[in-house]
Amino acid sequence: MRKRLAAFWRTITAPFRFIFWLLRLIFGWIADIFRDFATLFKKDDEGEDAPVIDALGKALENPYSVFEHLNALRKHLFRATLVLLVISAITFAYAENILSILAQPIGGIDQLIAVEITESIGVFMRVSMLTGFTFALPYIVLEILLFAAPGLTRRERMFGVVAIPLVVILFVVGMVFAYFILLPPAVVFLKNFIFENNTRPESYYSFVMALMFWLGVSFEFPLLVYVLVSMGVIRARVLLEQSRIAIVVAALLAAAITPTIDIFNMLLVWIPLIAVYYVGVGLAFIAQRGRDRRLRQA
């Protein structure tokens, strides 16, 4: 009788125990994030500009330290992935509205014809993931910064905090540029090229999302260059001297990103990529001047 009562008690209390476990997990996770976030504002114990390569070499000398870094990386990746999945699940409810907006360059969602029965759900999931990534990007960048924080100076950590909104802004600007500037002429060219075609949702949304994503990533270059020059990984003059190679690389990237084969649409991508590169070079010289001044004062 006692065993039956115990089993009955475990059964009726199981939902409450699960809720308690879930709340403890969530609040523990939040507390862990705040503890990691507090490390961004602690004062430095060492010099201001320790070389990154030397710091990496010291970390690799101790195998135990390597495993600690791997465990920390796993923790930050797990949290970032979990937030990405949660936000993507939330945006799934608004995927139909997002699909309608993305279909405007082709004349509306009615212009798309699904061939396979699972095609619609696949498109919904891809659009939800891209939208979720866009909204989760600030937190993903924060997790990257929290992982790198122990090896950064206080000044670098503060710059990382300020850079989080800049990363999001640049990514969104790249996506907006792809949607409003590049996509309309590209769709007109592809739709009217020799043969009349019935466009599938999967093919249309795949190339639209790829175009917007990679343009968004490309627009992060100036900020990335500023960070690398500030950390002493590269020098600004090297970027200026290699500008001819960068122009060729930008042309190759434009050819890979552009969904059409005409030179007009390629130029629509190529010219902004070159402009983004030279903006990065300008920021690199600003970062180089600031770094040289700090080294002279040290």
PLM features per residue range, with description:
Residues M1-A298:
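Membrane topogenic/interface segments and analogous intrinsically disordered interaction regions
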